[in-house]
Swiss-Prot record:
GO terms for cellular component: cytosol. GO terms for biological process: regulation of glutamine family amino acid metabolic process. Belongs to the GlnE family. The keyword Methyltransferase does not apply. It holds the Pfam family GlnD_UR_UTase. InterPro entries: GlnE (IPR023057), GlnE_rpt_dom (IPR005190), NT_sf (IPR043519), PII_UdlTrfase/GS_AdlTrfase (IPR013546). This is Bifunctional glutamine synthetase adenylyltransferase/adenylyl-removing enzyme. It catalyses: [glutamine synthetase]-O(4)-(5'-adenylyl)-L-tyrosine + phosphate = [glutamine synthetase]-L-tyrosine + ADP; [glutamine synthetase]-L-tyrosine + ATP = [glutamine synthetase]-O(4)-(5'-adenylyl)-L-tyrosine + diphosphate. Keywords: ATP-binding, Magnesium, Multifunctional enzyme, Nucleotide-binding, Nucleotidyltransferase, Transferase. It comes from Psychromonas ingrahamii (strain DSM 17664 / CCUG 51855 / 37). The gene is glnE. It is an enzyme of class 2 (transferase). GO terms for molecular function: [glutamate-ammonia-ligase] adenylyltransferase activity; [glutamine synthetase]-adenylyl-L-tyrosine phosphorylase activity; ATP binding; magnesium ion binding. Its EC number is 2.7.7.89, 2.7.7.42.
Length: 946
């Protein structure tokens, strides 16, 4: 126990330097020393605010079991004296600290049961939120008028408390998930300048978030997470009742039904609150018995398991097998299935729900009691973990001091006894979870004995070859396979693997060998799989995933057999193995218009303030979507143009998200630039060039982009740290590039190429639209005009989009000497071929050889530059080659035969390049391929350009 004593003495000395502790009674001194040893949070709170200890002891709060009335009246009294928001922020933070110290003190010293703690933590949060909301609502009514509906009825502000706050079971150090709403549209009354209710309540919501979430010298009250609102981060901060109802009826998803079970309305009593409480019941609780909820919960649990593996979480009492989340899923499965017919199940709290399940006979009482016991045990552990440092953690500690703190509070004399009890409780929970929600998937048959011996025994080369030959491989192939397998075994011996991992590997490999031997080139496939196995050998969770899911193992081998690139991707990022569990999803990429929504959903699980996790998650999302696209591509369920569409739309969704978070970071630091104050614009655009602009991205494509901002940006930002608007946009661009190019565990997001901006590498990072246009008109080379043909805005607002499109059309449509243009393009093409073509005699470079893809792209650009002065609107509309050729045919610039030959050749060459890329092969092929296509392109080129 010396570690606890040392910690207590250290904190006691620091506290004694701030306040005289000699007057403490012996019992008070004993309690203080105990709690200082157990909690850094309590110690640091008392050191920051020494008078707090005297206050608590004098008022006997530390010995009071029911403190709800004290919390309410004390907070009302403190807020009644508040005159401004700065003071409000301070009062809320100090009040929260004081009462959280009381909660921690009582629970850590065994004075309070878990139920008391959960009750008071949740009640404290309710009062802080409600009284903060009430003060700000009144203040804003004085400033902007009272919000009314069209009938002149005052409109109140309501909050959905979600998650554990909604269920009144908030944990000690927790985010609070909120959704804001108000009843009806209308305007404010009482001030000369009226504003609409949406604007009033949006501003109020922002002030409430600031009052609770913002970190000041006194800390914060709660981390506020608003991402569960309709349409997530891309949706408005607040919506009215009608819009909320419409959203959940039209767009509500299974996970939102699950989330809304615990949604509790906070706000003033009355008809509006009653209406709101009834509003979403039809969405959450179906009138029929809804067994589809089981599959939805199963998928959600699979996503959580995937996250645990992805983050490498170990000993996580919330998300791990048998953790708190599985208990919640058990209870909520019954609520979703039967809650529409059994109103008793429409309750918010987990403990209450479990008790109801026993009362109505849905689950035997002894099993409910087992779940309740486990829940109380796990939540008690969670509270202690969080009371140590007021940190949101559910992972068991790995340092001896915190381990000792945990077992001391939990009543154990050693770690092993505690850990055994914890595992026993979690095993019980997982068994119950499997009974209610577990997957019915049958385990695969074990591979036959011979293959088990091949893997487990040290057979000679001759014996292994003979065994494989008997399994159907020809003798030469069997010998090569035996050699490759022996090499794999030798490599695995060099890698650390525990007993559990070794046992799993020994079960997995015979089955894997059996499946590999069915393929035409099992040696090559084994070599591809070897790289993955070496990467995951020390990560037992992934070995278990493949061993326990035969379907996932089969999908893995199929994809790796078809594509070296996919095999390498899986080896570099084994987190993607989780995506193999659902073949229906795997071969069905996200719909083009849904990438933004899917990205928002994926990012919901990541704390907004944790930029490192945000960057990592963005890369994981991209890799997952790449896998879906590649799988569908390999399966030929989508064709080449669709592959490029998917890759391009994905890049645009990621670009949109990155710009948004970069913008929020900049605004948080410097405020809004003056040119957009009072609007929802950013005055900023990203222009995609090259393959991104032409909607022709491949798997390894860079993003060629140019950044633009508004023309008139004189002035500065309106934040506490004001900077010039020009500097704001420059730093915004730098931030965007950093978010894309920073290397995390999952690599970079995309390579960003800025060389096509005005003046190239020597040019400024962000240009105004006017200076961009001026440069292109007066200083740009012909090749820059060619590049402009494939340019389009990929992030923008309407105003800046219109200006960019006008600039692009003006430049592309300017009159040119077509003969001189043809000469320039021809000369440029010859230079490129000389420096970039890789083919040798008897070979063909799909990209650079005569008749190759670049010839076709240059020809499309020539057609636009040569003829846009006569038909600019039509020719400047598209940035992709195929639609440019189609437009030229409609305008009479190409014959139907010429259009077909060009598009046919371009698609064939791109498809071939694409297939080679999937297997990480060079674009150089034998010279006897695509002869007719090449001749067609050369003939058309010569007709127009020679």
């Amino acid at each position: 126990m010396s570690l606890l004593n040392d910690a207590a003495l250290h904190h006691f000395e620091n506290l004694n330097n701030r306040i005289d502790l000699n007057s403490l009674k012996l019992s008070q001194h004993t309690e203080l020393m105990k709690v200082l040893g157990l909690s850094d949070f309590v110690a640091e709170s008392l050191i920051k605010q020494p008078a707090l200890l005297t206050d608590l002891l004098d008022n006997e709060l530390l010995s009071l079991a029911d403190r709800k009335e004290v919390i309410t009246t004390e907070l009302e009294s403190a807020i009644a004296k508040v005159k401004d928001e700065v003071t409000l922020h301070r009062v809320l933070r100090l009040f929260r600290r004081k009462h959280m110290v009381v909660i921690a003190w009582r629970e850590l010293l065994g004075k309070a049961h878990l139920v008391e703690s959960l009750d008071h933590i949740s009640y404290l949060a309710d009062q802080l939120i409600l009284q903060c909301m009430s003060w700000l609502y009144k203040k804003q009514c004085v400033e902007q008028g009272i919000p009314m509906n069209n009938e002149g009825v005052r409109q109140p502000f309501f909050i959905f408390a979600m998650g554990k706050l909604g269920g009144k079971e908030l944990n000690f150090s927790s985010d609070i998930d909120l959704i804001f709403t108000y009843p009806e549209r209308g305007e404010t009354q009482g001030e000369r300048r009226r504003i609409d209710n949406q604007s009033f309540f949006t501003k109020l919501g922002q002030r409430i978030i600031g009052a609770l979430h913002q970190t000041t010298v006194d800390g914060f009250v709660y981390r506020v997470d608003m991402r569960l609102r309709p349409f997530g981060e891309s949706g408005p901060l607040i919506t009215n009742f009608a819009s909320i109802e419409d959203y959940y009826q039209s767009h509500g998803r299974d996970w939102e039904r699950y989330a809304m079970i615990k949604a509790r309305v906070m706000g003033e009593e009355g008809d509006y609150k009653t209406t709101l409480e009834a509003l979403l019941k039809p969405f959450v609780y179906r009138r029929y018995i809804d067994f589809s909820a089981i599959e939805s919960l199963r998928k959600m649990k699979a996503m959580i398991s995937s996250e645990v593996r992805r983050k490498g979480l170990k000993d996580n009492i919330k998300l791990g097998k048998g953790g708190i989340r599985e208990i919640e899923f058990v209870a909520q499965a019954f609520q979703l299935i039967r809650g529409g017919r059994r109103a008793e199940l429409q309750c918010k709290g987990l403990r209450e729900t479990l008790k109801v399940l026993a009362e109505i006979g849905e689950v035997p009482k002894e099993r409910v009691q087992s779940l309740l016991d486990a829940y109380h045990f796990l939540r008690a552990v969670e509270n202690v973990l969080q009371q140590i440092g007021d940190k949101q953690t559910q992972t068991l500690p790995d340092n001896e001091l915190d381990k000792l703190r945990l077992i001391t509070v939990m009543g154990y004399s050693n770690w092993q006894d505690f850990y055994s009890k914890l595992n026993q409780e979690m095993d019980n929970v997982h068994a119950e979870f499997n009974w209610v929600i577990g997957d019915d998937e049958e385990a695969h048959d074990e591979a036959d004995q011979a293959l088990s011996e091949l893997w487990a025994l040290h057979l000679s080369q001759q014996e292994a070859t003979h065994l494989l030959h008997e399994k159907g491989l020809d003798e030469s192939l069997a010998a090569h396979f035996a050699t490759a397998l022996s090499a794999l075994k030798e490599e695995l011996k060099k890698r650390p693997i525990g007993p559990r991992g070794q046992a799993t590997l020994d079960k997995l490999m015979p089955r894997m060998i059996e499946l590999i031997c069915v393929y035409p080139d099992p040696v090559e496939l084994l070599n591809r799989i070897t790289q993955l196995l070496l990467k995951i050998i020390s990560r037992t969770a992934y070995l278990e995933l493949l061993n326990e899911n035969d379907g996932a193992l089969k999908q893995l081998l199929k994809l790796c057999n078809e594509s070296t690139r996919v095999a390498s991707q899986l080896a570099r990022h084994p987190i993607l193995l989780d995506e193999l569990l659902d073949p229906q999803q795997l071969y069905k990429p996200t719909q083009l218009d849904n990438y933004r929504t899917e990205l928002q959903l994926f990012m919901l699980r990541i704390p907004e303030e944790d930029m490192e996790q945000q960057m990592e998650a963005l890369r994981q999302f991209k890799q997952i979507q790449f896998l879906y696209i590649a799988a569908a591509d390999i399966e030929k369920s989508i064709q080449l143009p669709q592959v490029s569409d998917h890759l391009t739309y994905l890049s645009e969704a990621i670009m949109d998200y990155v710009v948004q978070i970069a913008w929020l970071q900049m605004v948080d630091k410097f405020g809004l630039p003056s040119n957009v104050i009072g609007s929802d614009r950013k005055g900023f655009a990203v222009i995609g060039y090259g393959k991104m602009g032409g909607i022709e991205l491949g798997y390894g494509s860079d993003l060629d982009v140019v950044f633009l901002h508004d023309d008139n940006i004189k002035g500065e930002t309106n934040g506490r740290r004001k900077i010039d608007n020009q500097l704001f946009y420059f730093r915004l661009a730098q931030r965007i590039i950093h978010l894309f190019s920073a290397r995390t565990n999952s690599g970079i997001l995309y390579e960003i190429d800025m060389r096509l901006r005005p003046s190239g590498d020597s040019g400024i990072l962000v240009s105004s639209v006017a200076s961009y246009k001026k440069y292109l008109q007066n200083n740009a080379w012909t090749w820059e005009h060619q590049a402009l043909v494939r340019a389009r805005a990929v992030f923008f607002d309407k105003l800046i989009l219109a200006k960019f499109n006008e600039a692009r059309e003006t430049v592309l449509s300017q009159a040119r000497n077509n003969s001189a243009l043809a000469t320039e393009i021809r000369d440029m093409r010859a230079k490129m071929r000389k420096h970039l073509s890789r083919e040798k005699e008897g070979q063909f470079d799909l990209k650079q050889s005569p008749g190759g893809m670049v010839d076709i792209e240059f020809f499309a650009q020539y057609l636009v530059l040569a003829h846009a002065c006569h038909c600019g609107e039509e020719l400047c509309k598209w940035s992709d080659n195929l639609r440019i050729f189609e437009t030229c045919r409609k305008l009479g610039l190409l014959t139907l035969d010429e259009e077909k030959k060009l598009t046919g050749a371009y698609c064939a060459l791109r498809d071939a390049t694409h297939r080679l890329t999937l297997n990480k092969k060079t674009r150089i092929i034998k010279g006897d391929q695509f002869i007719q296509e090449r001749q067609n392109v050369i003939k058309i080129w010569e007709k127009f350009l020679d």
